[in-house]
Amino acid sequence: MTYTLHRRSLELQGQTRKYLVVEPESLPSRPDVLFFFHGSLQSGNVLRRFTNNTFDALAERTGTIVVYPNGVDHHFNDCRGTLPTKTRELGIDDVAFTREMLTRLKDEYGVGRTFACGYSNGGQMVLRLLIDAPGLLNGACIFASTFGAGSNHAPSNPDSAYEPTPVLLMHGTADPLAPYEGGVAGVDASQTRGEVLSAPETAARLAKWNGAEGPVEERVYADIVKQCWTGDFSVELWTMEGIGHVIPSGNELDARLGKNTTSFQAADVVERFFGL
């Protein structure tokens, strides 16, 4: 292991907010920072295991500082109108939390570029950052999440606040919790997260906002189709056929999440897309 794991905390809104910082042994003078927001009921450490430590390995080989924030009561206050969680009840400001973490990281390390990945609820948090913290990110990656539909799309800022940002999306067509084709997201009717757009609709909306052209479609693996919208701010959608609510990381996960793929590892694609 050629990195140090730091457990950090800060005070915000009367809450002690915690986050993990993976600091590689070899750091450039202005290292990039990659925030990775966990899914519902997870934590930073759970996400590290969930991804088979592949993003810790990314930190090691690229000199990127990887940060795993912890949500309040294991959730982030994302951009959906429907979010029946404690973090929404308390009005937690996870945009401010992200800004404060980044300020502290800049003070300590002198940061170059800033990126964010998010899975499920964490992916929704990244979508919120794109609109409610425009220009904060140099790139975003969203796993198993799509824009809310209609009134379920509820960031604080209007969509017009968005600033063009390269975005990578990965979504399984057999996702049981965040339907690839859109519809009602959530475990069941009692735990719904409201109506959401499809993955292709979400990618197309981001591409339009980015002024990117396409898509050009390519089958990159037997079970993976990549669609690319190109321009100064590109968008890629990786459609994972028959795959569930997962982050491809070469490991076996809870069968209730659906099938995983062994065709590729997400961390490798993120590294290439962000140019880490």
Predicted regions and their residues:
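Structural cue for short, hydrophobic secondary-structure segments
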Residues: 36-39, 68, 239
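Acidic catalytic loop of the alpha/beta-hydrolase fold
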Residues: 175-178, 245-247
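Serine-hydrolase catalytic-loop signature spanning alpha/beta hydrolases and amidase-signature enzymes
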Residues: 41-46, 74
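Active-site glycine-rich loops that stabilize anionic/oxyanionic intermediates
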Residues: 31, 39-43, 243
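A domain-start/cap signature at the N-terminus of enzymes
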Residues: 1-33, 46-53, 58-65, 90, ...
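Cap/lid segment of the alpha/beta-hydrolase catalytic domain
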Residues: 70-93
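Alpha/beta-hydrolase active-site loop
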Residues: 86-108, 128
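Short beta-strand/loop motif that positions the catalytic acidic residue
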Residues: 169-171, 175
